[in-house]
Regions:
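Short intrinsically disordered coil segments
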Residues: 23, 71, 103-107
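Generic alpha-helical hydrophobic packing signal
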Residues: 3-5, 15-17, 77
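Glycine-rich beta-strand-turn "strand-cap" elements at beta-sheet edges
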Residues: 2, 40-49, 76-107
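An amphipathic, aromatic/His-enriched active-site/gating alpha helix that lines ligand/cofactor pockets
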Residues: 24-25, 29-37, 56-90
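Short, well-ordered beta-strand segments in beta-rich or mixed alpha/beta enzyme
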Residues: 2-9, 38-67
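Short, surface-exposed ligand-recognition loops at beta-strand->loop->(often short) alpha-helix junctions
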Residues: 9-22
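Intrinsically disordered, low-complexity acidic/polar segments
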Residues: 15-17, 50, 62-64, 97-100
Length: 107
């Protein structure tokens, strides 16, 4: 399993609007993507204009396809609500109780 994280800082007072946009526009797009598994959106309790979206993918290739084919349009959709460009990072999932993945142990 593979993840993409997208860290954002919204313009003042735009966090709720971004959350609504993600729920109404972004999630339906994600759900149609090959290999998409799940999306978790976190909002900072101390900095309410900061958020982190974590998407889970079956494979790195699925996430890369989404990044190339769909993410540019989504980035344009959310850009007016942001203070800065989103920061995208990718990770292999090592352990997850939700997705029933356990770290492999060396023999």
């Amino acid at each position: 399993m593979f993840t993409r994280t997208v860290e954002v800082t919204t313009k003042s007072g735009k966090a709720q609007e971004l959350t609504t946009l993600i729920n109404d526009k972004v999630l339906p797009i994600l759900k149609k993507q090959t290999g998409f598994v799940d999306e978790t959106v976190l909002v900072s309790d101390t900095e309410p204009n900061r958020g982190l979206a974590i998407s889970f993918w079956n494979t790195k290739q699925d996430a890369e396809r989404y990044q190339k084919e769909q993410y540019p349009a989504i980035q344009e959709m959310i850009r007016p609500l942001l203070d800065a460009e989103p920061v995208v990072r990718t990770f292999n999932v090592d352990t997850s109780t939700t997705h029933k993945i356990a770290a492999t142990k060396a023999a």
